[in-house]
Swiss-Prot record:
Gene source species: Aspergillus ustus
Name of this protein: Nonribosomal peptide synthetase ucdA
Record domain Carrier: where: 585-665
Region described as Adenylation (A) domain: spans on this chain: 25-413
Residue ranges of the region described as Thioesterase (TE) domain: 684-934
Catalytic activity: 2 3-(4-hydroxyphenyl)pyruvate + 2 ATP = atromentin + 2 AMP + 2 diphosphate + H(+)
Keywords: Phosphopantetheine, Phosphoprotein, Transferase
Name of a matching Pfam family: PP-binding
GO biological process: fatty acid biosynthetic process
Source organism superkingdom: Eukaryota
Length: 947
């Protein structure tokens, strides 16, 4: 028989014996649980519906909305069905804001949107509706719920049969881009199609469903309650606090109730992992690729052989977390693919796309965040070229994620504008996410289209900034309680970046406040290139949803309303006072002049806060600003000789720099090693310069690597006219090898080169291995093993043009045009032509003269000339190749570059090469807009090599 609506489903299941039961745990600690059969649920719902109709029948017009505001699962379940039996539409209320102003505004918005709905609640919650008149709650204790049902007062008769599959069954609330919720209409047909699709995609065993999130979330309502009913299975509902405080209780419940399916977002999985590490019955060990394995010492504690699926969504799932939790649970009998990341929204009736091959698929494809998988029946997906575009992009290309199908909603209640905006002209729902579909049909989310922040013309995803802050493990910040957004201050022409967070320190611990602010600022500066507005807030201002998510839209709206002004001003005043009190003053006139020159060059800086011991690089300055500082200091201090950039890099404070500058008049000895980053205890990372010889290109990258020291090799010849370039590869390799062993006598070693530097890194690694040293990581940044053909193309003029494009003095297209013009020119003529065609603004930014460019080009040409007959020989233990869009002269596409050129590294390694696709092109892969994603890929590759 066709199920016409949800009420038909309830009646049919209630009439079947042994169709399962509903178990609800009390919200009170140690109060146990109660259970009801589906037959008892129907009776309770009929009684509640009759009591409501008896008292408020005139207001219960068919199709009218009834807001359900309850804290217990059982209340929500009973009254959901009671309202349906009354011919009305249940609206599941979310938790009300604790802030009085926001709560009133929210209720007024609901009253307008839902057109004066009835509201049901318990007496214990009625105080939440104080100080407002928009929504007047009905206390269910005032209804006559004890009256027995008879044929004359049974509400399950005619009304349920008038509702068809297209009619609205329920309304759920979801946050919109302005912070105001939208009301999502879920039809009977949509909900039933979604439940069937989930059962088809992930068939349950003969066990039960476990839910621990509130019924206002679509996953609890549809993915557990309705789906379990359709499957004739038992469902268990547990209050979230019962589990969040003690994550292993989830396993206790699975074991006790023989649960086959449950739900856990990434934040809970991370907590479960940590709880298992510290559990008396387990031991945590680090495996070879750096991941933590958790071994069960007493496997009998939990029998998880019943567990088939832990759905996970609502936030990105880290592959490593999925791997570690899966391995831990497998110790107790769970299958290896127990974690099922997925995608779902209120508009799609919760999860509709599932990754059933996690973490194996994601590890094989080297995904930092797990794929969300493939579609269940009832939904189709596409990636479009634009937000409103109907044109799909090719497989593997990111774009705007859209969905369609029977499980997708049709409208927002009483909001035609939002409904129109939500769909494309051909009827596909715009999810607001950015994503791509890989060659196997797996979907991966890459960001949110509406939350993009634009900084200096570059788009950034605020989620990636929050991830960076959380990954930094800052002591003064509660993990996952940070929120990043951008806004345009009044009177400003550019957006500012804001980050609010929940602190761990006491309010009067100013030193911790200052250190936390500085740490957050450094991370954000590294991610987006500008200093953020950092504001600590209390937990009342950072309320999470039932899935543990902070609403960025709501937080941003509160900031724009000025609700955080007091906290911002207090934080600013305390930090400023602390820095003034602890500032180190100059000791002599030279330090005073040098400090003033630095402040003038890098300003605006507060002279009362920036002292001689303040690290200059902590300001997050770019390589361009570093070069500007060099020229400004040379001019203001009237030094007799240029300041080498190496001096600025290796002497990061005014005091250190002053000492170095006093010695500048003496004889300089070439040292190839530049220490870019000194923090961390992991294996140091050594970076070899590209073909231009300089290491400035690594500055952006080094900022992100705080868990290990970062060194770079700088070519000889850049320090002045007295410093001669290398004459052959062997000389360079031996020089770098000797310097490396002096700085790091023992392995394991990690070394990588950018472009030309990859060849030198390969040769240095061979020399290390020949001397019985272990090289755990060798990286090639976009260079194949065979390079002599390209090197022979690069005469002095080509090197000069190559350098000019690398320094952004001109475009690649203009450099190619000049190549023909300069063919018969002398060196001096070529240099003059390049200077004439170079961007004057860029030359000024670099403070680059004709003689300076000539010296640089001579070094670049010397390096290229060394490799015109280079042939790779022998092999290394392994290699990681990071590849991007190639130069136009070497390959027509990224895929051709990989298959025809880079893949040949496999001929020179004793294990398969690991290839990593990264963003950008050959000259931009480490630029500010790409370096954040690049460093994540690099750090993951280092971890996977066991270092």
């Amino acid at each position: 028989m066709l199920i016409r609506n949800l009420l038909c489903l309830l009646e049919r299941v209630a009439a079947e014996p042994m169709s399962g039961e509903i178990i609800c745990y009390s919200p009170h600690a140690n109060a146990g649980y109660c259970s009801w059969s589906y037959t008892q649920l129907l009776v309770e719902a009929q009684r509640a519906s009759h009591a409501l109709e008896s008292t408020h029948g005139k207001a219960l017009v068919p199709g009218s909305r009834v807001l359900l505001h309850f804290t217990s699962h059982w209340d929500n379940i009973v009254w959901f069905w009671a309202v349906l039996l009354a011919g009305c539409i249940p609206v599941m209320s979310t938790a009300l804001p604790t802030n009085g102003f926001l709560r009133k505004a929210h209720l007024e918005h609901l009253a307008r949107t839902l057109i004066n709905p009835l509201c049901l609640t318990r007496a214990v919650s009625v105080s939440e509706f104080a100080d407002q008149d928009a929504v007047n709650p009905i206390v269910i204790e005032s209804l006559d719920l004890a009256k027995p049902l008879g044929p004359s007062n049974n509400p399950s008769g005619s009304r349920k049969h008038t509702r068809g599959l297209e009619d609205t069954a329920a309304v759920l609330l979801t946050s919109g881009s302005t912070g105001r919720c939208k009301a999502v209409c879920l039809s009977h047909g949509q909900v039933l199609a979604a439940a069937r699709g989930k059962l088809d995609a992930l068939p349950p065993a003969d066990e039960s469903f476990l839910n621990w999130i509130s019924l206002d979330h679509v996953a609890a309502l549809v993915e557990v309650h309705i789906q379990a009913m359709l499957a004739r299975k038992t469902q268990i509902h547990v209050p979230a606090p019962y589990l969040v405080s003690q994550p292993t209780k989830l396993l206790d419940l699975v074991h006790a109730h023989r649960v086959s399916r449950t739900f856990a977002p990434n934040f809970f999985l991370a907590r479960l992992r940590e709880a298992l590490k510290n559990c008396p019955t387990t031991t945590a060990n680090e495996n070879l690729n750096g991941a933590t394995s958790i071994r069960a010492d007493q496997p009998s504690r939990w029998d998880l052989s019943c567990l088939r699926c832990i759905n996970s969504g609502g936030e990105p799932n880290k592959t490593r977390t999925c791997q570690e939790v899966s391995e831990a649970l497998a110790q107790y009998g769970a299958p290896g693919n127990i974690i099922v990341p997925g995608f779902g929204m209120t508009e799609t009736c919760a999860g509709a796309i599932f990754n059933q091959h996690c973490p194996r698929y994601d590890l094989d494809h080297q995904l930092e965040f797990a794929s969300v998988g493939r579609c269940m029946p009832g939904i189709s997906i596409r990636i479009s070229a634009g937000l409103n575009s109907n044109q799909p992009v090719p497989i593997g290309q990111p774009g705007f994620f859209q969905v369609a199908g029977p499980v997708v909603f049709k409208e927002y209640f009483n909001n035609k504008h939002a409904t129109t905006e939500a769909f494309t002209s051909d009827g596909w729902f715009k999810t607001g996410d950015l994503a791509l579909i890989d060659e196997r049909g797996h979907l991966s989310l890459t960001g949110r289209s509406k939350e993009t922040m634009i900084v200096n013309g570059v788009n950034y995803d605020p989620q990636s900034v929050e991830d960076a802050v959380n990954e930094a493990s800052i002591p003064g910040l509660v993990p996952s309680f940070s929120c990043c957004f951008s806004c345009l201050p009044a009177g400003s022409e550019t957006e500012e970046i804001c980050l609010v967070y929940l602190p761990t320190y006491q309010k009067d611990d100013v030193a911790a406040r200052v250190e936390t602010t500085a740490s957050i600022s450094r991370v954000v500066m590294m991610a987006v290139g500008v200093l953020p507005q950092v504001i600590p807030l209390d937990e009342a201002h950072l309320q999470k949803s039932s899935l543990g998510k902070l609403s960025r839209a709501r937080v941003k709206a509160a900031y724009l309303r000025g609700e955080y002004n007091a906290q911002r001003n207090l934080n600013h005043d305390l930090i400023r006072a602390f820095r003034r009190e602890t500032r180190t003053a100059p000791e002599n006139e030279f330090e005073r002049d040098l400090l003033a020159a630095v402040i003038d060059s890098l300003g605006p800086l507060d002279e009362d806060e920036f002292g001689v011991d303040t690290p200059i690089l902590d300001l997050g300055i770019t390589s361009i600003e570093l070069i500007k500082l060099k020229k400004d200091l040379e001019a203001s201090l009237r030094l007799h000789r240029d300041i080498p950039l190496i001096t600025l890099l290796t002497h990061p404070t005014v005091r250190d720099l002053g000492t170095a500058l006093r010695k500048l008049q003496g004889t300089q000895v070439y040292d190839p090693v530049i220490k870019l980053q000194a923090e961390g205890t992991k294996t140091p990372l050594w970076l070899v310069h590209p073909g231009v010889g300089e290491v400035l290109v690594f500055l952006n990258l080094a900022k992100f690597i705080k868990d290990r020291p970062v060194y770079a090799f700088r070519a000889r010849g850049l320090g002045g006219d007295d410093e001669r370039p290398f004459t052959n590869i062997s000389e360079a390799v031996k020089t770098y090898y000797t310097a490396l062993k002096h700085e790091q006598p023992n392995g394991p070693y990690a070394i990588a080169g950018y472009s030309y530097g990859s060849m030198l890194a390969f040769e240095i690694s061979k020399l290390l291995e020949a001397n019985n040293d272990r090289v755990s990581f060798i990286g090639s940044f976009n260079l194949p093993p065979h390079i002599k053909t390209r090197m022979r193309q690069l005469d002095f003029k080509e090197c000069l043009l190559h350098l000019s494009y690398f320094l952004d003095l001109m475009t690649e297209a203009r450099a190619r045009e000049l190549a023909d013009e300069l063919r018969d020119c002398s060196r001096d003529g070529a240099l003059e032509t390049v200077m004439q065609n170079a961007s004057p603004t860029r030359l000024a930014e670099l403070a680059l003269s004709s003689s300076g460019l000539l010296r640089w080009a001579n070094v670049a040409f010397a390096l290229q000339s060394m490799a015109v007959d280079y042939e790779p020989t022998s092999s290394v233990s392994g290699l990681d190749c990071f590849y991007c869009i190639p130069l136009a002269v070497v390959a027509a596409s990224k895929q051709q570059w990989l298959e025809d050129h880079l893949a040949k590294w496999n001929d020179f390694t004793r294990s398969p090469v690991r290839f990593h696709s990264v963003g950008g092109a050959h000259y931009t892969m480490l630029s500010p807009e790409h370096v954040f994603d690049f460093q994540k890929t690099l750090r993951r590759a280092l971890e996977n090599r066991g270092i």
